[in-house]
């Protein structure tokens, strides 16, 4: 239930109403992960250089921390998008199964009515 609650709040917070919007959000988040991961990699490489001024070192470390926090959030968002997509497919399958069961029940009732209707006519 907690997972469903998180998914609901995620969809609400990001104003996602359709599967297409969910896919678009996920793709954007994945692309952002790629971009800022590369930025973080470059900053970490810069940290290894000798003779960097102390102020620049602090700026780099601060930015790496910011990127790491953003990456954590984006990765969680991507996981949520994947979980929501799976859940929506499961719900769609269950709805299809339910509809099939209901249709069979309606057909069974019609068949019974036809049988009973024929016996009354004789």
Predicted regions mapped to residue ranges:
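Extended intrinsically disordered terminal tails
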Residues: 1-122
